[in-house]
Amino acid sequence: MTFKTVLENDKVRIMRARMDVDAREGLHTHAADTIVVHLSGGEIEDTANGKTVVNHWKPGDVEFEARGSSHSARNVGKPIDVVLVALK
């Protein structure tokens, strides 16, 4: 997954990110409450707490990742572009 910071200040860090087909993010823990806005649709296989689900995202969908939440992810569809807003 590639990340590019587009704005950062004492309140937020805003990043654009792209996850290519079959790209994987290993197990990681979110350091901040993060809002994810999907710019493109696709499918992400998400594993957390021993459970694996495939999420189907459409352009404009929004999700929330809580500070301290842990999971791994794999893109099982087409390339996905998102904007991440991490609250400080």
Q: Model-predicted segments: where are they?
A:
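Local beta-strand/beta-hairpin segments that build beta-sheet-rich folds
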Residues: 1-7
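Short acidic-glycine-tyrosine-enriched beta hairpin
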Residues: 8, 50-68
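Extracytoplasmic/periplasm-facing segments of secreted or lipoprotein envelope proteins
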Residues: 10-24
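Residue-level marker of beta-strand positions
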Residues: 24, 43, 61-62
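Short beta-strand His + acidic residue motifs that chelate non-heme Fe in jelly-roll/DSBH
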Residues: 25-27, 45-46, 70-77
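Short, conserved beta-strand element in jelly-roll/cupin
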Residues: 29-45
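Ligand-binding loop in jelly-roll beta-barrel domains
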Residues: 67-88
